[in-house]
């Protein structure tokens, strides 16, 4: 049988692998319509593949090709975000607002994704290809108060669900940064257990102790820095910072 996503010679993607640009649900509710977004993502992948194999004028180029792997559970750039005692905003990042509970730094641009206009020509409101628009910022330390819930006493968060706005998430959400925040949360959790307190009590009462743990880190300091690509095209370190 044939899929019906409307592919033709002009609208089909002549590719042999996926890229970050394949992104569905940009005009949908990322939480309430998550199942639809996943299903539509699978639909366009298999629809495009079916067209290339069966109906494309140059289908012989794909005759001996087969799909090796398609993720059933796709990666999410954005979904639920929880509210902490501080909500990080675009203004915080752009104006480099300094907070006394600074933790791990983000080193990426404010990277926001939108439907690709070329894809919109054929799939208006049902786009599955994206473009990104990046705003350069200085590397910015995430406040500790973004890493725990303001209304659930014993809950930390450290990934793409931390207390930030949609725009601020554009720089925070990359894996190396969320990994660093995970380390911070682990350190803070150890202090909560040690001192028998909730996450909110760490700042300011035990924050100096947390700072010492963060300065010590958990990595091997003698290893070379091979993660420069994670720094994006930032404005470089901010000078005259307290």
Predicted segments — roles?
Residues 1-242:
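Flavin (FAD/FMN)-binding glycine-rich loop and adjacent Rossmann-like elements that form
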